């Protein structure tokens, strides 16, 4: 028996030589060890040179040369790993597990960071390049800042060192051979090299996943620089000057990390079948939290630089941002998430190393902070409430609160493991419930902050600057309420909470106030969110118009706020107003609906005429299912979503999109073969209380009632909604009756699961695949009786109104950060020239 991950080694035609002729793996391991030693030497010599004795330049020179050796070593080792991937060196475990002969060149290159060891190596390379830039631009801060960066770099390199000290393993090498990784596998011990690899995960074979990790890791790597400046400021007692050189790095870090997060969201939207771009997955959140804290830190740094306030907040948040980067790495790579997240890596035994890294960074950063806290400058007066610095500071605190809410929800797997020995996640409703009101406050402050002046404003001036944005925002919000489906959706939600939702919201019967809030509260908050988004849009738009005519590089803040406001409007439109195309499918207190379509069948759903016309193949050779659409205006188009079972036994369902400016049509399918159907199988729709004859007049199936008390063994921690269907199956000839209770489950990431029931004595299997709450009907997939066409699809189709605003908003947000990076870099260069003069 081969260990897990080594299946498929039977097709082999090469025998390992006692010593590999190329020795690439040995060279790669050696380069990593040399880089680690160089990192230690660089850190020690930079630490020594920061003492300002007569040998400063000599020690600094050694530190620079050592960092140069580290950089060359990491780049060379990364290049060797790419070479092994491209040349199909399947004797190496990393190459075997992440590549195959069928992969094109771009995916072979991307495989270099698809696995855990390779992504660590990519991060190390980014850190090395960041260090080179710091040595060039940090000036008098170079030595202490580089000492901190070197410490972090050494921790990272130990993750891929591949050493064994006694019984303690230190890291997992990307250059480990199959023999080294699976020493007990008999076929490997026989010296057999596989002729092909397991290949890259099919979900990762996407253009956006080729560029997403390098950008994300450049953000992670850049986050170390402001952290190092903050530690240096506390270490050297330079509590004020550190902000100017650190601010461009902070802005670049949140820019890169934000773009990386956005690309990941776009990948999820066009690749996964849950119909969205953010599922509040713990690993997604673990990147979001340091980004939010990083943005909050940027705002407090600006306040400190401009007004002399917020020294403590700027230092604390800057330190916290990087510690959360390390914490996100711990969540992703320690194995603590297990199967909770689709993004988590396989556990490589790095738990203790990652925990030590977090503790070291926390002790270094927060230890110095609390040690020096009483020495930090105190402002001579508190900022006026009606001032820009107060609004920016308050906005940073609200953003921090949002991040802490997400952090709390993200950390529940750790708390579950500590207190229940059972990691679990919180439902999506937790994040929405707490983040929505906080986002409303933050957006309102984002509008106020740019309109207010520094220092004090009087009430008359405030009224003057707020009048136009408030009037325009009010008009726009009223238009949204009356001219879009917003009012209809709010009414539908209230009706559901008042009728169909009684079983799900029984607590509301005991308090009329809670009843009213449960019916109208969420959409009222969403309407307020729309208002403050328009307010921030118009307020910052007015500021940007005035600034851009004079000096465009000063418009970064306004552009970022405009982008965030537009993005929020896009989120509200595409999520709150998402329109499921289909009313004969599943709607369980959720916007998710689906319907079943047989080959050649035509249905009319929400004004769309939809025909399942056949099968096809896309440009990458993947199987597609062809759906012919005629929209309500008579326009014809074809959708070709992908669905197939990968060689890893995983079903891949890539949606197809029809994109317009004002909406997207999103379609994903689950083919009948997913449910194990054969020729003696099919599907029916049946209403509560009705019965249907199935098979060749052999059985009667009756839908008795819904079952809202589903056995907990079927649920799991990620269950959002679970509904069972109590069925009575009667054998017509004998009169014998059996009970069945298949279950329909919606997970917290909006994916759907089906708990099938099988009657082994009759060899009949039933799956509950969808439902319509309004009509009380359900969809059943039945196997074991001849009853329906064998080729059918479960179709998930949605209109996503104005989802383009999400992407347009993030582009504006990123452009604003880019303008700010440019502005602060120019300011730093000018200040450096003045100092030199």
Give each language-model segment a name:
Residues 11-12:
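Cysteine-centered motifs
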Residues 19-837:
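Solvent-exposed, non-transmembrane regions of integral membrane proteins
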